Amino acid sequence: ICRKLYFLFPGDCFYLKLIYYLEMGKKLRLKNPKAFSEKLQWLKLYDRNPEYTKMVDKISAKRYVASMIGEKYIIPTLGVWDKVEDIEWETLPDKFVIKTSNGGGGGGVFICKDKSVLDIKSVSKKLNFALKSNIYQQYREWPYKNVKPRIIAEECLESEAETGLKDYKVFCCNGEPKLIKVNYDVETDYKSNW
């Protein structure tokens, strides 16, 4: 539905108000946002720091982090490709992660634990779909507007813990950290802890 609405309502402010109302069931307050979700919409419209585009592109974000704190904090890259047909599947190790550079969430992320049973055709189809997704058009997240859709493969990190690897997210309001969210069991039974 977002893709269709994008072309009907080209103005970012009107579009975000409409989508917010449809998803949240209430009016979006942009003049004095109080709720976290309202503040996020305000940021989409008024905080246009060009550095954000580097941060949402998974490939350029890795380069940025490496330049700031060092390569040892970066998951090693196995390959980068512009299209699915260019992926050199035979050169990838038995375990790896492959994902698109232009998306958020997990729609374009695939964790391979055993390449011998990987359905390359299915993963390729899903990667192609993810490469065509446009978060800027769907949600007006402007940092994604100029991200070149690519595919990146990385080493697969594993944990000895029963819950697997943990993903920490720090949420800030007005520049201050307010919440820490820990995601775990993302491969089997997704759980969050606030």
Where are these regions (language model features)?
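A conserved helix-loop-beta module that forms one wall/lid of the active-site cleft
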Residues: N32-K115, I120-W142, K148-R150
